[in-house]
Amino acid sequence: GLEFLLFGSGPVNSTGVEAGAFLNPINPKDLSYIQAFFIPSMYMYADTIGVIKEDYGMSITTVMTKPKSRGFVKLRSANYKDPPEIHLNLLSHEEDMKMMIAGQRFFLEVLKTKPLSNKIEKIIFPDLDNLEDRNLEEHCRKSVKTNYHPSGTTKMGADNDKMAVLDSRMRVRGIENLRVCDLSAMPNINSGNTSAPAMMLGLRCADLILGS
């Protein structure tokens, strides 16, 4: 912060994500299932790839935009004070794993391609000489984590959908005068950032309330 105030430079001078990309590394003509972030810092946890000594660098993160893996939340006990058990089951679906492996391999190949490779001193990755599926899968499972844009926890749906908390007018079933109009109401997440859909849901809910 002080470097930016004094000289107008330093990490605070960055937006945090300098560039991004949407792609489908398995079928480029199909919908994009990977969103990539290009971050101007060494963005990696010490327990996944080791302590990074380099001061300057760039990180690329690959994010699944439409994951098929499903986790669950269940009660830990009959005591309401006990926190629930949360099982994310990240990358448990075979197609998610295939897409993540393809995304990792795609960007590693990009970084090794000229003329970009001429500007790169070092690529930090467990084993650059062995990009077989098994090794990439191991890396993905060690470094996978959740990202932004949680949604769909109180989704809209048809009357016969037992998992649908809300009706089509965003009203909570079984409770009068209560609606949910944030991203929780989305039945499915969109393939990308959720700011615009969140605003749209709020606007639509306001129209529904005023109309009723």
Task: Describe the role of every protein-language-model region.
Residues L2-P197, C205-S212:
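FAD-dependent oxidoreductase catalytic-site/capping-region signature
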